[in-house]
A protein has these predicted regions:
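Asp-based phosphoryl-transfer active-site loop
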Residues: 3-20
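Well-ordered beta-strand positions enriched in small/hydrophobic/aromatic, beta-favoring residues
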Residues: 7, 72, 151-153
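A sequence-level detector of short linear motifs
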Residues: 17, 82, 173-175
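Short, glycine/acidic-enriched capping/hinge loops at junctions between secondary-structure elements
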Residues: 19-20, 76, 163-164
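Active-site phosphate-binding/coordination module
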Residues: 24-121
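Conserved acidic, metal-coordinating active-site core of Asp-based
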Residues: 111-181
Length: 181
């Protein structure tokens, strides 16, 4: 059995410019690595829709990891075995490691009952509001809203509310990751 190199990379602030979301500065490196036959596997907080768009724009053809490790997508025509426990979706073998978004939303909604947390979900917002908050164009904002495994929220509270919400999530084993800073 031979060992082949693989490059795993984040997107935000790595291949994508933190302020403009452009990958143009990385294009020539991606092309050279791709020409050498080395797979580039993005591992990101981005959604399936966002990564599919990125892969297309950068001519990437290998697998990818979405929503902070919630799922692995491997093209069905890849020269590797189908990941155990995977299902077929849109030309990819998908191995899910996280819960579906709706199950998470149900837990988060129950958690918020009786509280006065000021928070708004990305999927509850208009796409134009997401674009304003994130700096994304409208089409990119829509792709960012197409979450399958995680729920991005705009936290609008201050003071003791954040530690209280964190403690409540910890009790039910829901992990939150702060992004966008």
């Amino acid at each position: 059995m031979s060992v082949l190199p693989v490059i795993y990379t984040d997107l935000d602030g790595t291949l994508l410019d933190h302020d403009t979301y452009s990958a143009e500065a990385a294009r020539s490196v991606l092309e050279r690595v791709g020409a050498g036959g080395i797979p580039i596997v993005p591992a990101t907080s981005k959604t399936y829709s966002e990564v599919v768009e990125f892969r297309s724009s950068m001519n990437l053809t290998h697998g990818f990891i979405v929503e902070n490790g919630a799922a692995l997508y491997v093209p069905v025509d890849a020269d590797i075995r189908c990941p155990m426990g995977s299902k077929l979706f849109d030309g990819f073998w998908v191995r899910e490691f996280g819960v579906k978004r709706q199950a998470l939303c149900d837990v988060l909604e129950a958690l918020a009952l009786g509280s006065s947390y000021r928070v708004k979900s990305l999927t509850e917002m208009r796409s134009s509001e997401v674009a304003d908050i994130t700096g994304l164009d409208l089409a990119s904002a829509r792709r960012a809203q197409q979450r399958l495994y995680s729920e991005t929220r705009d936290w609008r509270d201050r003071g003791a509310a954040l530690p209280a919400a964190r403690d409540a999530r910890t009790r039910i084993e829901v992990r939150a990751v702060m992004g966008g800073v």
